[in-house]
């Protein structure tokens, strides 16, 4: 019964039509199985027409989520209207953020395609097995990971964006390297969004401190690296 309820919540008629569009465009063949869930979205494992593994993120047409989205979009300078258009705008904003992060040199899923409330991106995993989140798999080199992740924060900042929700839950451990995921809370870098950048930095520093790393960069050092070239 719960599975049927989930199916109806995710695969409404609009989403089903959008999946058909992705299939006809050759971006995916079919949705093979779920690999991640959240309050506003589901992520499914799939393959493209050439057999390459991909992931498909579906933003749900959920009325509860919709109530929160207008303020979310307003904070990001996006005007929208209407239920479906607002969900689509939210999805487009996330895709563009993923694209910007990826192009700036951040290790993240490769952005492949976008249609309405669907995002197609590279699959982080191997042979249908998704990479585990860093909160579940902490078998990695502390020094290398810390250097990489702080570097990712700076690269995103210099490209004009902030992840906005950076934590070990949104970092995957694949091939012993960190991959950032879920850019749905990302923001444009301005003096007004500095607190979100500060929060990301502190989340990472606090996490690595718990893991036993001592020589951490300071919040101010990261802010100087980011804003120094933005002024």
Summary of predicted features, one role per range:
Residues 93, 148, 203:
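Charged catalytic carboxylate motif
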Residues 6-131, 154, 158:
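Conserved ATP-binding subdomain of kinase catalytic cores across diverse folds
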Residues 165, 169-171:
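Catalytic-loop signature of eukaryotic-like protein kinases
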Residues 2, 7, 195-196:
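Polybasic/polar functional segments that serve as interface/processing modules
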Residues 128-140:
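AlphaC helix of the protein kinase catalytic domain
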Residues 145, 157-163, 174-231:
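C-lobe/activation-segment region of protein kinase-like
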Residues 141-152:
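Conserved alphaE helix
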